[in-house]
Amino acid sequence: MAGAKEIRNKIGSVKNTQKITGAMEMVAASKMRRAQDRMSASRPYAETMRKVIGHIAQGNLEYKHPYLIEREVKRVGYIVVSTDRGLCGGLNINLFKAALNDMKQWSAKGAKVDLALIGNKASNFFERHGAKVKAHVAGLGDNPSVNDLIGSVKVMLKAYDNGEIDRLYLVYNKFVNTMVQQPRVDQLLPLPVTEDSKLAKKHHWDYLYEPDPKQLLDTLLIRYVESQVYQGVVENLASEQAARMVAMQAATDNAGNLINDLQLVYNKARQASITQELTEIVSGAAAV
């Protein structure tokens, strides 16, 4: 059994760690609330944009934008949104598993895969696995803007325009609640039709465009992709802070349990030490 002094040092070390994880839990909770506010503010715009674009994809357009046309898939692109830092449980690894599963399905069909990565964790993971990375951005902080993402988005859009990729997906963690973050693989291009099939049957979504369909769609569809990527980033940020808060809470609780266990061991060691001293005293007195 370890000595009482050694156990006491371990208890002190665990208590210091507990203070750190407790502080990180409070910081993550504060950041999560701010991230939720940004996510809630941008979500209605992103969802409405998705619905409108879905309706446009079903319409009988005179001008058929390239982003609306299905083509043979020889190469698939993914924009993967991860975190820059760890200590957020299995958030990133669960996301990477979802991405890899989707990539394997396309690889089985003979398609190649290109990646644009957001966050250091994605870069470290996929570069270690030998993936082809066309763009990478990191260090977005706790308050990212669309301008921070435009570079990576443009790289993938240019690749799509040039026929270098035939389908584009966004991979991110959707914030459901504090305890649940759901890995998502959403198709960006070609534009998916609206999921509301009942509504689609009742209506034919034909629009009148001013000044002309090409000019408007060229701008609108790029804004659509940018808005979806931005929404994915803020959703992932809220998910990161929630996962980190839960992980740090669990670490703090585990530290408390470990301290209690060590305290019992310390008490037993101290009791054994006292018993041994008393035994030695009695033995010495008897010898005299």
Curated annotation (Swiss-Prot):
Domain of life of the source: Bacteria
GO molecular function annotations of the record: ATP binding; proton-transporting ATP synthase activity, rotational mechanism
CDD domains: F1-ATPase_gamma
Keyword Transcription recorded: no
InterPro entries recorded: ATP_synth_F1_ATPase_gsu (IPR035968), ATP_synth_F1_gsu (IPR000131), ATP_synth_F1_gsu_CS (IPR023632)
GO biological process: proton motive force-driven plasma membrane ATP synthesis
Bilayer disposition of the protein: Peripheral membrane protein
Function per UniProt: Produces ATP from ADP in the presence of a proton gradient across the membrane. The gamma chain is believed to be important in regulating ATPase activity and the flow of protons through the CF(0) complex.
Family statement drawn from the similarity comment of this UniProt entry: Belongs to the ATPase gamma chain family.
NCBIfam families assigned: ATPsyn_F1gamma (TIGR01146), PRK05621.1-1 (NF004144)
Protein's recorded name: ATP synthase gamma chain
Species in which this protein is naturally found: Aeromonas hydrophila subsp. hydrophila (strain ATCC 7966 / DSM 30187 / BCRC 13018 / CCUG 14551 / JCM 1027 / KCTC 2358 / NCIMB 9240 / NCTC 8049)
